[in-house]
């Protein structure tokens, strides 16, 4: 990928994909995009002055590198191998960077299927949310052959910092396990705020203390005041996506004969919130369920 910048075909300009694709356009990469939501695709194309691809096959034919960032592995399979998929039109020697939070075993299968066509696929899911997607400061967990990752590094570096995780599928495994840790930290942190509030400590004070103490985590730093205590619940990451990632993490445990009772409990709590609050509720709204169970509300909307 040395010399002229490779042409990129970007599949999925949703909450995460749109700012990531925008970063690549700003960096000077020739980029075409496809999204199955025509209105969303048209809005992105108009904002960034690009022509949307009419079909996945059209996108594949004119791209050196394909980036997919989609809701789940089933949709990735449809994009690649479905009746309207792009696999048959991918150029030999092209690369697919699979940035969905996907199922590792399916990612391995996708890679093997495309290898027979002379196409490389490796997984590179991201962490950091929409704010860091906008600034190109995501954490990228890359699983695959190191030579393939190295060749794509100029593209990946536009989007964030890359940590190679090992063989194909390990990036997706690491993403799911990261969200397992993150989701557990969120739940226990909210319970601590509820307990402390009932005792008489101001929630904002508790967050301040946690952030300079050993209880600090991503949720105490970037979620509790911003989305829960403010009552905004609009981080941009939906409840069903969290449940999906936790299901993947638990599946990895089961496939590897690991007894993981806390992971199982964590996943069940989030699945319960998903059932009660709805799959499109923001994941930070899980705090509402904890509040309902305790009979107390923490935080309040800012005064207008």
Predicted segments with their positions:
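NAD(P)+-binding Rossmann beta1-loop-alpha1 motif at the extreme N-terminus of oxidoreductases
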Residues: 1-69, 94, 163
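Rossmann-fold dinucleotide-binding core
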Residues: 8, 101-180
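Hydrophobic beta-strand scaffold residues
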Residues: 31, 52, 120-122, 163, ...
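Rossmann-like NAD(P)(H) cofactor-binding subdomain of soluble oxidoreductases
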Residues: 39, 56-61, 65-66, 70-138
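Active-site-proximal catalytic alpha-helix in oxidoreductases
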Residues: 135, 140-143, 163, 168-199, ...
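Interdomain hinge/lid region at the active-site interface
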Residues: 168, 172, 222-284, 290, ...
């Amino acid at each position: 990928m040395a010399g002229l910048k490779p042409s990129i075909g970007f599949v999925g300009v949703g909450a995460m994909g749109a700012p990531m694709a925008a970063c690549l356009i700003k960096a000077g990469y020739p980029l075409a995009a496809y999204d199955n939501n025509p209105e969303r695709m048209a809005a992105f194309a108009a904002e960034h002055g690009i022509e949307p691809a009419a079909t996945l096959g059209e996108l594949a034919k004119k791209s050196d590198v394909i980036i997919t960032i989609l809701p789940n592995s089933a949709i990735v399979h449809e994009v690649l191998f479905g009746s309207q998929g792009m696999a048959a039109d991918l150029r030999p020697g092209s690369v697919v960077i699979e940035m969905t939070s996907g199922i590792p075993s399916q990612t391995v299968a996708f890679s093997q299927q495309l290898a027979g066509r002379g196409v490389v696929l490796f997984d590179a899911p991201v962490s950091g949310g929409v704010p860091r997607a906008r600034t190109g400061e995501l954490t990228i967990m890359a699983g695959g052959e190191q030579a393939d990752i190295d060749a794509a590094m100029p593209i990946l570096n536009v989007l964030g910092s890359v940590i190679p995780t090992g063989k194909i599928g390990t990036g997706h495994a690491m993403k799911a396990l990261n969200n397992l840790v993150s989701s557990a930290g969120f739940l226990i942190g909210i319970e601590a705020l509820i307990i402390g509030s009932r005792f008489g400590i101001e929630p904002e004070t508790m967050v301040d203390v946690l952030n300079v103490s050993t209880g600090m985590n991503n949720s105490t730093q970037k979620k509790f005041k911003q989305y829960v205590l403010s009552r905004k619940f609009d981080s941009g990451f939906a409840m069903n996506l969290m449940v999906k990632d936790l299901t993947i993490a638990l599946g990895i445990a089961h496939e590897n004969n690991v007894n993981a009772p806390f992971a199982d409990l964590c996943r069940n709590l989030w699945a319960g919130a998903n059932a009660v609050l709805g799959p499109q509720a923001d994941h930070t709204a899980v705090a509402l369920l904890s509040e309902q169970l305790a009979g107390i509300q923490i935080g309040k909307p800012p005064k207008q």
